[in-house]
A protein has these predicted regions:
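Carbohydrate-associated surface elements
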Residues: 163, 184-185
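Conserved donor-binding/catalytic core segment of Leloir-type glycosyltransferases
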Residues: 1, 200-228, 242
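Membrane-proximal helix-turn-helix segments that form the acceptor-binding/catalytic region
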Residues: 78-82, 101-112, 124, 138-157
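Acidic anion/phosphate-binding donor-loop and adjacent secondary structure
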Residues: 169-173, 185-200, 219, 389-390
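Acidic donor-binding loop of glycosyltransferase active sites
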Residues: 155, 265, 281-299, 313
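Nucleotide-activated donor-binding/catalytic signature segment of Leloir-type glycosyltransferases, i.e.
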Residues: 244, 251-278
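N-terminal subdomain of nucleotide-sugar transferases
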Residues: 1-52, 156, 402-423
Length: 423
């Protein structure tokens, strides 16, 4: 059973890759996640994966809003986990953060012989600090505590990069053998370059593309300021910009874009299909990642970087540690948070087609030969093998129902039979 709260499945690419890979290797997989406009079904089976979704009736704003969302989603997840236990059964819960609160479910199900895996997507304390500029308060330290409890509860931990591995070893005091670096490599079967579509440039010679979530910490406001400088101060009026993705900050960013007088050449698409995404990325001349420096961003692997590289696109980004590891020579790096220098780096690439081609080819080969999911997924299977070897369970590839599940199922069937007899 995989639990994810941030995004619905299959929109959450990491979780979907994990689920399908496990299924392809013989595991029975269920997922609990939120609904969305794109994925409104409460239950469906996709590619053999049982997906259970719940509705979140409000959009989180501010700390209290996020807290309410986390509590509501946690309760819905707990409810659905019981349904999965009864209907499908499971031996392992894999909880993806944020939030770092599902260790409580892990502890509960450990009472019935289930194991708990922590899939560490985000450094929650550092993300909170990036959102609310608070590193000293009670809430920051509470998040540190929740992270430690989650790491302690987990039998094994999946992390996205070496920086997160260090956190698991140092802050969580995990054994090295229990921490697996599972990089979210792109799926080359899903992401494939297509013929460029000049119409997407909206009558201008160049297209610059941003892909990703639009939350307060994602730096899209930095990008808009860089675009303003590039267009009005460097007189680059020959460039269209497209911003692809959704998130809680979208409407505020659209208003900012309108107020800056850039609505004619900066366009927000919202979330798009894989086919439309391939058209945009195949057409773009330059792709950008404006994540500003924070401890969270500096230590996090940004999936957009790898997806740009699949399409052989040169990248402009702020000089952050894990972005540098992923892109290497496929990107030009601006001093962190310097929007003018960021704009200048875009200008350099627009003026140098040979540089763009060389950087793009390097990045594409790095993904194809090293960073694609086909190369990065083995630690996922190794982590599950470690869990099942410890359990010495014969159900490693087809989870059996626990005694509790069977008892509950018998009670359920008894109630149904009683009601049927009453009719």
């Amino acid at each position: 059973l995989i639990i994810v709260q941030n995004l619905p499945v299959p929109l959450d690419r990491r979780v979907w890759l994990e689920a399908t890979t496990l299924h392809d290797h013989g595991y029975q997989v269920s997922v609990i996640c939120p609904k969305s406009k794109e994925y409104p079904a409460a239950h469906e089976v996709v590619d053999g994966i049982q997906i259970h979704r719940y509705h979140i009736p409000f959009e989180a704003r501010g700390f209290l809003g996020y807290a309410a969302e986390f509590i509501y989603a946690w309760l819905q997840t707990a409810r659905l986990s019981l349904r999965v236990l009864l209907r499908e059964g499971f031996d392992v819960i894999q909880a993806c953060n944020p939030p770092d609160t599902y260790f409580l479910l892990g502890l509960f199900y450990k009472l019935f012989g289930k194991e708990f895996i922590f899939d560490h997507h985000d450094l929650s304390p550092e993300m909170y600090s990036a959102k609310f500029n608070d590193r000293r308060g009670l809430l920051y330290h509470a998040l540190i505590l929740l992270e430690k409890l989650t790491l302690k509860t987990a039998k094994v931990v999946l992390v996205t990069n070496e920086s997160y591995r260090d956190v698991a070893l140092e802050r969580g005091r995990k054994d090295q053998a229990d921490v697996f670096v599972l990089r979210t490599g792109p799926d080359l079967k899903r992401l494939r370059p297509v013929e460029p579509d000049p119409q997407l440039k909206r009558g201008r010679p160049y297209l610059v593309c941003y892909l990703g979530e639009m939350c307060p910490q994602d730096g899209v406001d930095y990008l808009l300021n860089a675009i303003h400088y590039l267009h009005f101060w460097q007189q680059r009026t020959d460039v269209s910009f497209v911003l692809i993705g959704g998130g809680p900050a979208v409407e505020e960013l659209k208003k900012m874009n309108q107020d800056m007088g850039m609505a004619d050449f900066v366009h927000f698409t919202g979330r798009v299909s894989d086919e439309e995404l391939a058209r945009y990325l195949s057409t773009a001349d330059v792709c950008v990642d404006p994540d500003p420096w924070s401890e969270w961003a500096n230590n996090s692997t940004m999936n957009k970087i790898l997806e740009y590289m699949v399409f052989a696109k040169p990248i402009v980004a702020f000089d952050l540690k894990e972005i540098h590891y992923s892109a290497r020579r496929a990107a030009l790096y601006a001093r962190p948070n310097d929007v003018r220098l960021f704009a200048q780096k875009i200008n350099v690439l627009l003026n140098n087609p040979e540089m763009r081609a060389e950087m793009g080819a390097y990045g594409q080969q790095r993904v194809v030969n090293e960073l694609a999911w086909e190369h990065t997924h083995p630690p996922l299977l190794a982590a599950y093998a470690r869990v099942f070897n410890r359990k010495k369970s014969a159900t490693a590839y087809k989870p059996a129902r626990s005694a509790l599940a069977l008892s509950l199922e018998r009670i359920k069937m008894g109630i149904m039979n009683y009601e049927e007899a009453g009719r």
